Amino acid sequence: YGGFMKSWNERSQKPLLTLFKNVIIKDGQQ
């Protein structure tokens, strides 16, 4: 269970962080 959650977090965290950074950049440009 713990290993599954860890691998899932590692896989899903990078796209989420990229999306989050893109939103911050867009908000800053507006």
Curated annotation (Swiss-Prot):
Location of the protein in the cell: Secreted
GO biological process, one term: neuropeptide signaling pathway
Modification type N-acetyltyrosine: residues: 1
Entry keyword set: Acetylation, Endorphin, Secreted
Top-level taxonomic group: Eukaryota
Family of the protein in this entry: Belongs to the POMC family.
Name of the protein this chain belongs to: Beta-endorphin-2
Source organism of this protein record: Oncorhynchus keta (Chum salmon)
Lineage start: Eukaryota, Metazoa, Chordata, Craniata, Vertebrata
